[in-house]
Amino acid sequence: HSGRDLVQNHLSFFVLNHAAIFEEKLWPKEIVVNGSVMMDGAKMSKSMGNIIPLRTAIRDHGADPIRLAIISSAELLQDADFNMESVSGIKSKLESLLDECSTLKKGEIDDLQTEDKWILSKTQSKIEEITEAVEKMRLREALHEILFTFESDLSWYQKRIQAKERKNVSGILHQINSTRVAMLSPFAPHVAEEMWEKLGNVELVSK
C-alpha cells in the first residue's frame, strides 16, 4: 500500500528488483495505491498552514470520525478532500446512531407484516451490496450505504409503522441495527463497540 505518486519510481523498482533477485513465488502479488489527501480542496502544505496534526485531530474529534471523513471523501485511487465540516457531520451521525442503539431492546418478533418483510429483505440486500463493495475496495460506496442509504430505508419503514400505530417492533429494529453496527465495525471500530454494548451484547462485535 503506497501513494499514487510513487508508481513511476519506487514501486516500479520494487517490482523489478524482486523479479531480478527472487524466484517467482516471492514476487509481489499486488500493490494498492491511494490518491493524495487534500484539505478543503487545496493541497496540504506547511506554507499554506492547512495541515492538521493527526494527534490534534484525533484528540479534538476522535479517531472514528476522522477515519470515516477520509474514507467518505473519495474512493481508493481518487484524491480525498478532507474538511472539518464533514468530520462534524459524521460525528453527529455516529452520536445519533449511538443514542438510537441505547433505546433498542432485544425482543420477540411477532408475525411479520408487509413492511417488516420489506425492511428485512432490504437489509439482506444491503449486506450483499456492502460485502461486494468492500471486497472490491469500494470503501466510500460501502460506507455511504451503511450511514446514509440504510437510514433512508429505516426512515421509510418507521413511517409505515407509525401510520399503523404499531408499537411492538423493537425486536425488528434491534435486529436491523445490530446488522448495521456489525457492518460499521471495520470502519469505526471504537464507536461500533459502544453501540454493540448499548444493544445488550456482551461479546465484542469484532468477533
Task: Locate each region found by the language model.
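Generic structural signal for well-ordered beta-strand positions
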Residues: 44-45
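Residue-level structural signal for beta-strand termini and adjacent loop
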Residues: 49-50
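Beta-strand segments within the central parallel beta-sheet cores of soluble alpha/beta enzyme folds
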Residues: 29-33
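Short aromatic-centered micro-motifs
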Residues: 37
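Helix-rich, typically C-terminal accessory recognition domains appended to large enzymatic cores
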Residues: 5-15, 19-28, 56-207
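Short histidine-centered catalytic/ligand-binding loop motif
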Residues: 1-2
